[in-house]
Amino acid sequence: MSRTLNEGFTVCQLRLYQEHHILASLFIDPENPDDFVAGYIEALNTRHVILRSVSPFGRYDGFILVRVADVTMAIGEDDYAERLRLLLHYRGEQPTAPFSLREGEDYLHAMCRNAQEGGRVITLWTADNEYVGKVELLDDMRVTIGRLDFFGENPVSETIALRDVEQASFGAEDDCLYEVLSRGSAHLC
């Protein structure tokens, strides 16, 4: 099956999961079957899917953006999804508040814009690096991140082409950890 046909099938499958509010697991590394993300599909187009992420411990965990082309398999309504749904229910978890998505806006751009407007930490992954920090500048082609160190301090400006970003997270527990460290308080997390 060609890559384009496969991506079209994936979009159709994910659209059904979104319409029926099915908790899905998206596998993104064919070499590592344990490399997947789980959650409810918040937004979907032919380029990206945004999940309202659910952690393996049954807690809502921000949002994660994945390129549709990188999804090697999607599974919904399996035992793992049922387990996560039960944990969400028993814990009384409430969904993460949505972020704004403007009409026709690129999803990655929207995620970066929301992080910038709220002064929040975002994580961007390229093929070679992971960038954790606050958005300093954003345009249609690039994002400049104040990349934080291990202690959430000493931001170093790094500019990344949006087309090079393979995944992004916003509002996840890891992002919040850096927000707490950089602010010295947990007021947002």
Language-model features, listed with the residues they occupy:
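Short glycine-rich, low-complexity segments
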Residues: 1-36, 54-129, 149-189
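Viral structural modules
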Residues: 1-2, 136-139
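N-terminal "domain-start" segment
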Residues: 34, 44-49
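Short beta-strand-centered aromatic/proline hotspots
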Residues: 35-42, 131-137
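Residue-level recognition of beta-strand microenvironments
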Residues: 44, 74, 138-140, 168
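Short aromatic-glycine-enriched beta-strand elements
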Residues: 47-52, 142-146
